[in-house]
């Protein structure tokens, strides 16, 4: 069988189905389009579901794709040879066109002829039937027609070979799976005698690998659970690229394929351990490889670390990778980010969004990993202290929740650390503590909703006068205290000048005053026919019916208005430079800055961005008039006014027009003339996914401050470098960068030389414990690579059974490297030694029996850590403490 790279498998798959009249679709984003109920894209079929459900008519009845997928259900299992989070799904689909005969025939043809897999290596499964649906004899017949012997076709129950429906009702049907047979030497039993040892059997995983699943949508499940035939059948297939690559590359694990090799090799360079060195380090390398791929693709598609939904998935895999990289191997945040960068480098050829987002991937991962390293330091100290006080083998859930809630230490890390120590977590106690906190949050939220509902029940109406006036003499219609917030009130005014949050624009703030006292308005919340103001009592008392003067913060409003009009001009300029395909995807308009998210499939060059900035400045300096008027929705359409996709509009709409070149439906507040915006500076334009960009801008005083500071900084740098002018800076910086790189290399070589010069002294002072030479000491080194080289030199100079453990200060961090002769590792493992000593340094570590690494932040503890190493080696090698 031909050894085949993953890129070639992808190409052959798409070519095969294109030749059979399939339209080739690009992968959809990992963020499901227009479906907030779905966390992440988990299958190739997701982008085609509207076609299967009959909600949309497909442009072509046949489709094929390579789809990015991310599944979280087995996240805790990642680290073994088979489980993944991110993967690529090869799939072909039929929407009422071909059915089982063609799907089975083409799958067989592609595997046996397109890839050259020997037919005798392939087994298949079909649905065995139950009380609701018969055995899939049709699929069995087609498999036998292509040449599969009957004894290699296994029937499996609905739990294994049935798909759908997605809810209680809807399309569903039997599946048929294709398995690759690694050979009888890998199986514990004969599948022909006992189906448990066959494909899909509970004991068959070691021998059989599922490579392709064919789903036959032929039934509709009704509310009573019964099935009826679909008028339009469908085909949905999925073949994991990682699995078929393992088959084509003769690998027993997906992690041994070219889809993982570059990132695993980079991890090996950083850690000094390779796959096969030991069970624990193998698990760590697989976690690093999988999570590096996952974080790179999630970030490229616009996900950022956070505490909700998919944002938390990204945060969790970065933190899980950091725990292994830093806690076990002592790698810093930069090295962790470099692993994700490596993924962008070697997978960016096919997945262009990775290449585009490479810098952003590094920035996000490095920032999140650095934050977690700080959390990990403090959290591990607290966790270790709690473990030392523990009586028994059960860790209190309340304590785990406090670590999580107060100190930000993730419960999954607590869970993993405890499992490694053989301690269980009181999960019920943790859930109770979590629920108590949620109940407190619910009560606060319900209090807010109760206040709004109470106003609504009174059938009050408030008139917004903020377009015309910045101050209003008005009356309080209703007032309620804010639950659990002493001195704060919710209130509704008869005439209200405060703009309530909406359309991306933040709410106005300001003051409400009367003879009785004064309130500071901190928020304005839209609530249908009125706006609810949230205010702090500065002095006095207020009640419904009071006559008051409401005044917005005028300076703040002007800054917001400038940014909102600038957003409209920016939108126009982007469409003028990049084309009409630019579509707004979201915005933030505040007093400090504006943020504009837009969809665009191409790459935005620096030249294009400069042109956008130039056009915006031109329109601002021309002092173009800004008009607002109300018209019908139909008339607004005729005028070409831009409308937000998915937004619901009434019959009458408000149009904001900037001198005829920009028209948008908008309910926000704006300047009267564009010159009021003042300065305008684009500060960033970052890609947040395959076709999503986020541009940020500052205007007015903020922009002037920014430009003034930038000019002052440039002048100071030019003076410091003794340059005639700031225009010489770019060339000077480039020259300095080259000199710095050269100096760093010279320092590294000098440190390595000093370290190697210390080898003689270390060898002379070697101890002997029960026939084993032991060398420990602190040496000079520039990085882990040099430290390992020095340890190799010591081991070679001593010769025979020797245990070498060296320490160094690497950029302010204490790092230990253990290098053991194989004979020594049979009695004591290098990974165990450094892991135990690492606690003294305030960190963690691990590795293989012969080579390991640890690190921590406490440099002053290096002598104590080395002394602990000597004690451990004395205990393990001679049976007594030193």
Curated annotation (Swiss-Prot):
InterPro entries assigned: aa-tRNA-synth_II/BPL/LPL, Ala-tRNA-lgiase_IIc, Ala-tRNA-ligase_IIc_anticod-bd, Ala-tRNA-synth_IIc_core, Ala-tRNA-synth_IIc_N, Ala-tRNA_ligase, Ala_tRNA_ligase_euk/bac, DHHA1_dom
CDD domains from the UniProt entry: AlaRS_core
One GO term of the biological process aspect: alanyl-tRNA aminoacylation
Keyword Aminoacyl-tRNA synthetase: yes
Enzyme Commission number, as recorded: 6.1.1.7
Transferase is among the record's keywords: no
GO cellular component annotations of the record: cytosol
GO MF annotation terms: alanine-tRNA ligase activity; aminoacyl-tRNA deacylase activity; ATP binding; tRNA binding; zinc ion binding
Top EC class, one word: ligase
Known catalytic reactions: tRNA(Ala) + L-alanine + ATP = L-alanyl-tRNA(Ala) + AMP + diphosphate
Binding site for Zn(2+): 564, 568, 666, 670
Role summary: Catalyzes the attachment of alanine to tRNA(Ala) in a two-step reaction: alanine is first activated by ATP to form Ala-AMP and then transferred to the acceptor end of tRNA(Ala). Also edits incorrectly charged Ser-tRNA(Ala) and Gly-tRNA(Ala) via its editing domain.
UniProt similarity note: Belongs to the class-II aminoacyl-tRNA synthetase family.
Comment block on domains: Consists of three domains; the N-terminal catalytic domain, the editing domain and the C-terminal C-Ala domain. The editing domain removes incorrectly charged amino acids, while the C-Ala domain, along with tRNA(Ala), serves as a bridge to cooperatively bring together the editing and aminoacylation centers thus stimulating deacylation of misacylated tRNAs.
Protein's recorded name: Alanine--tRNA ligase
Gene from which the chain derives: alaS
């Amino acid at each position: 069988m031909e050894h085949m790279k993953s890129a070639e498998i992808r190409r052959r798959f798409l070519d095969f189905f294109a030749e059979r009249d399939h339209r080739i679709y690009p992968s959809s984003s990992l963020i499901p389009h227009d479906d907030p109920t779905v966390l992440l894209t988990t299958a190739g079929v997701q982008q085609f579901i509207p076609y299967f459900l009959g909600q949309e008519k497909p442009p072509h009845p046949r489709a094929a794709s390579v789809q990015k997928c991310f599944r979280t259900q087995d996240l805790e299992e990642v680290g073994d040879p088979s489980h993944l989070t991110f993967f690529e799904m090869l799939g072909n689909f039929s929407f009422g066109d071909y059915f089982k005969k063609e799907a089975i025939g083409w799958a067989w043809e592609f595997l046996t002829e397109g890839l050259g897999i020997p037919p005798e290596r392939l087994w298949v499964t079909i649905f065995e039937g139950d009380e609701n649906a018969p055995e899939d004899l049709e699929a069995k017949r087609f498999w036998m027609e292509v040449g599969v012997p009957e004894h290699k076709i296994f029937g499996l129950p609905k739990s294994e070979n049935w798909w759908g429906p997605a809810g209680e009702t809807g399309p569903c049907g039997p599946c048929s799976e294709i398995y690759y047979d690694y050979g009888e030497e890998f199986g514990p039993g004969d599948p022909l005698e006992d189906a448990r040892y066959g494909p899909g059997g509970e004991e068959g995983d070691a021998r059989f690998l599922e490579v392709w699943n064919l789903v036959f949508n032929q039934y509709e499940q009704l509310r009573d659970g019964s099935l009826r035939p679909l008028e339009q059948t469908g085909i949905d297939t999925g073949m994991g690229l990682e699995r078929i690559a393992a088959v084509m590359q003769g690998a027993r694990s997906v992690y041994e394929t070219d889809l993982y090799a570059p990132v695993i090799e980079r991890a090996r360079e950083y850690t000094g351990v390779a796959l096969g060195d030991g069970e624990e380090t193998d698990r760590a390398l697989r976690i690093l490889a999988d999570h590096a791929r996952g974080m790179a693709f999630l970030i490229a598609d616009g996900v950022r670390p956070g505490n909700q939904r998919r944002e938390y998935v990204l945060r969790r895999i970065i933190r899980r990778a950091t725990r292994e990289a830093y806690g076990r191997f002592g790698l810093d945040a930069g090295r962790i980010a470099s692993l994700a960068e490596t993924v962008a480098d070697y997978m960016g050829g096919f997945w262009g969004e990775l290449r585009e987002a490479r810098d952003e991937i590094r920035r996000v991962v490095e920032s999140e990993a650095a934050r977690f390293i700080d959390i990990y330091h403090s959290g591990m100290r607290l966790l270790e202290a709690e473990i030392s006080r523990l009586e028994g083998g059960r860790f209190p859930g309340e304590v785990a929740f406090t670590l999580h809630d107060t100190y930000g230490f993730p419960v999954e890390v607590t869970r993993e650390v405890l499992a490694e120590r053989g301690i269980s977590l009181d999960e019920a106690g943790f859930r109770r503590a979590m629920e108590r906190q949620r109940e407190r949050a619910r009560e606060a939220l319900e209090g807010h909703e109760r206040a709004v509902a109470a106003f609504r029940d009174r059938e009050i109406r408030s008139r917004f006068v903020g377009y015309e006036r910045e101050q209003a003499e008005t009356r309080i219609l209703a007032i309620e205290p804010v639950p659990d917030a002493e001195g704060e009130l919710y209130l509704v005014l008869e005439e209200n000048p405060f703009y309530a949050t909406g359309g991306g624009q933040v709410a106005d703030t300001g003051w409400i005053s009367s003879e009785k006292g004064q309130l500071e308005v901190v928020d304005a919340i839209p609530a249908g026919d009125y706006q609810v103001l949230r205010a702090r009592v500065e002095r006095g008392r207020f009640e419904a019916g009071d006559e008051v003067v409401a005044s917005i913060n005028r300076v703040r409003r002007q800054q917001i208005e400038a940014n909102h009009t600038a957003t409209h001009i920016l939108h126009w300029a982007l469409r003028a430079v990049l084309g009409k395909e630019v579509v707004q995807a979201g915005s933030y308009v505040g007093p400090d800055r504006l943020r504009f998210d837009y969809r665009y499939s191409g790459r935005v060059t620096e030249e294009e961005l400069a042109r956008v900035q130039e056009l915006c400045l031109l329109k601002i300096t021309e002092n173009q008039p800004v008009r607002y008027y109300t018209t019908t929705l139909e008339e607004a359409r005729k005028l070409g006014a831009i409308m937000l996709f998915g937004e619901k509009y009434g019959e009458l709409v408000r149009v904001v027009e900037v001198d005829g070149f920009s028209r948008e439906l908008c309910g926000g507040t704006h300047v009267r003339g564009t010159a009021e915006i003042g300065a305008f500076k684009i500060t960033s334009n970052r890609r947040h996914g395959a076709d999503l960009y986020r541009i940020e801008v500052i205007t007015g005083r903020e922009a002037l401050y920014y430009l003034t500071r930038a000019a002052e900084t440039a002048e100071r740098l030019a003076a410091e470098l003794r340059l005639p002018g700031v225009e010489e800076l770019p060339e000077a910086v480039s020259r300095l960068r080259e000199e710095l790189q050269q100096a760093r290399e010279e320092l590294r070589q000098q440190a390595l030389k000093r370290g190697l010069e210390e080898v003689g002294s270390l060898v002379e002072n070697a101890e002997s414990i029960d026939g084993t030479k032991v060398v420990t000491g602190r040496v000079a080194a520039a990085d882990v690579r040099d430290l390992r080289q020095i340890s190799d030199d010591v081991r070679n100079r001593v010769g025979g059974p020797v245990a070498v453990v060296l320490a160094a200060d690497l950029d302010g961090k204490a790092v230990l490297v253990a290098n053991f002769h194989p004979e020594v590792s049979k009695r004591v493992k290098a990974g165990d030694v450094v892991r135990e000593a690492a606690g003294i340094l305030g960190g963690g570590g691990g590795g293989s029996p012969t080579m390991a690494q640890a690190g921590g932040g406490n440099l002053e503890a290096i002598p104590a850590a080395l002394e602990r190493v000597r004690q451990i080696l004395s205990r393990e090698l001679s049976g007594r403490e030193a």
